[in-house]
């Protein structure tokens, strides 16, 4: 049974009803509508922690979706799942691909920065200070880009940039 027919709670039911209304109202071709159904089911499965099912739906949506902006969000969600599973290199690939399609996606930029910062922390713990600093610098570059796009977000990142001397005057408003 498709996930959209297994609405177990009010939020899922509401989301499904709204999504179905949007699908009927938007002037989209059959392929785009089918891609959206897979994307919607992927988001629902992801919210339930059913990552394998979510990935299956997202991959199917990718085969159908042609719009670059919509594809960027599918790729972003795939990246989130891989990051959640500790597959940071895979997550980075999907986030980068999402940014290629949609450069104005601060959440993907932030997530890339978080991964590089995490890797920097691990390198520091392993006594690899030069590697840690290089990873921190990468994190800083991505956080600066995210902050430029969403200056009121990522306050902790802004503070980290200031504390570590990696901030620039033009980043903060």
UniProtKB/Swiss-Prot annotation:
- Record function comment: Essential for the assembly of the photosystem I (PSI) complex. May act as a chaperone-like factor to guide the assembly of the PSI subunits.
Which InterPro entries does this one have? Answer: PSI_Ycf3_assembly (IPR022818), TPR-like_helical_dom_sf (IPR011990), TPR_rpt (IPR019734), Ycf3/AcsC/BcsC/TPR_MFPF (IPR051685)
Q: Which top-rank group of organisms is this from?
A: Bacteria
- Annotated protein name in UniProt: Photosystem I assembly protein Ycf3
Q: Which GO terms describe its biological process?
A: photosynthesis
Thylakoid as a keyword of this entry, yes or no, is yes
Q: Keywords in UniProt for this one? A: Membrane, Photosynthesis, Repeat, Thylakoid, TPR repeat
Report the gene name. Answer: ycf3
Residue ranges of TPR repeats: 35-68, 72-105, 120-153
């Amino acid at each position: 049974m498709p996930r959209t027919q297994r609405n177990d709670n009010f939020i899922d039911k509401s989301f499904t009803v709204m999504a179905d209304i949007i699908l009927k109202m938007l002037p989209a071709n059959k392929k785009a509508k089918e891609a959206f159904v897979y994307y919607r089911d992927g988001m629902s499965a992801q919210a339930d922690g059913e990552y394998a099912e979510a990935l299956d739906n997202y991959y199917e949506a990718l085969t159908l979706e042609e719009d670059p902006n919509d594809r960027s969000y599918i790729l972003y969600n795939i990246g989130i799942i891989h990051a959640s599973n500790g597959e940071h290199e895979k997550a980075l690939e999907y986030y980068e691909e999402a940014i290629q399609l949609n450069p104005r996606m601060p959440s993907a930029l932030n997530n890339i920065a978080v991964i590089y910062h995490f890797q920097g922390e691990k390198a520091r713990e392993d006594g690899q200070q030069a590697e840690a600093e290089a990873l921190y610098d990468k994190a800083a570059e991505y956080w600066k880009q995210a902050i430029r796009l969403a200056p009121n977000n990522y306050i902790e990142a802004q503070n980290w940039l200031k504390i570590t001397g990696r901030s620039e005057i033009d980043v903060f408003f």
